[in-house]
Amino acid sequence: MSSKQLNIGLFGFGCVGFGLYEVLSRTPTLKASIKRICVKDKNKSRPIDSSHFVYDREAILGDEDINLVVELIDDADAAFEIVTEAMRRGKAVVSANKKMIAEHFAELLVLQRKYKVPFLYEAASCASIPIIRNLEEYYDNDLLERIEGIVNGSTNFILTKTFSENLSYPEALRQAQQLGYAESNPILDTGGFDAKYKLVILLAHAFGLVVPPEEIVNIGIDRLGALEIRYAREKELKIKLVATAYKTDEDKVAAFVMPKFVNHQSKLYTVDDVFNGVITKTCFADQQFFAGRGAGAHPTASAVLSD
């Protein structure tokens, strides 16, 4: 695909969609351009001319000149319909929809093999951190024993404010909502569901396991109380929402998402604000640490662009 012009059909023009548009506009040397953008709301004010937009998905899916579909919408069910139909029509697909991918992983892999088209989703795991590519390429010949990390920027922002500025949990959450890091109904983030969907994706690339999301335990930061926060402050610890997967002594894999006390020795201790951080442990290379922005238009768009 890299040797020919990529004609992109983009679904969604929110934060990340606009970020991708800007990034592509600033890199004219790339052999890629957005031909059409499909959105739902005709009346919504947008920062570029309305001639770029279409409102029927068939305008993209039925266009034979479009050879790459980029899916960046919130609706997981609609995203699955778009992605599967694009693959059936022989179009390459890039997606950032971690919920859709986690819930339909097995089906999507079957479709990818059947129609022999690229299906890439680096942005669905840790935004700007190229963790999937490293798991697939760098660790291909090493034995991965453990992977854990902060993979949700919204909750990390809330926890950072709680400890660095001594804000209460409700105050920190309200600030995250005001800045657009958390939704008005933030349970997907604060309940650990977003992190769980990302862990499902990491499990597939770290250990070759395709696991339904409901099989992974997730406990979110919404379960934290004043006692845990006070204890962490007294002991000079931080609390981080950590997604963890590791091989057990019985050669099985344990996986879960939950808040964790971290001390100064942990690499995750320094991962604050909306940043993500991932630690891998392998048989030969031992520990390695990756960090990068886990939220925002341009960081996430950079991962979409790399795909």
Predicted regions and their residues:
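Rossmann-fold NAD(P) dinucleotide-binding segment
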Residues: 55-96, 102
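C-terminal, non-catalytic macromolecule-binding modules
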Residues: 287-307
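Glycine-rich adenosine-cofactor-binding loop
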Residues: 7-22
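NAD(P)-binding Rossmann-fold cofactor-contacting core
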Residues: 26-47
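Rossmann-fold NAD(P)-binding glycine/threonine-rich loop
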Residues: 80-85, 98-136
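General beta-strand structural signal in soluble alpha/beta enzymes
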Residues: 53-55, 71, 94-96, 119-123, ...
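Conserved anion/nucleotide-ligand pocket segment
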Residues: 137-202
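Substrate-binding/catalytic subdomain of NAD(P)-dependent oxidoreductase enzymes
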Residues: 173-270, 275
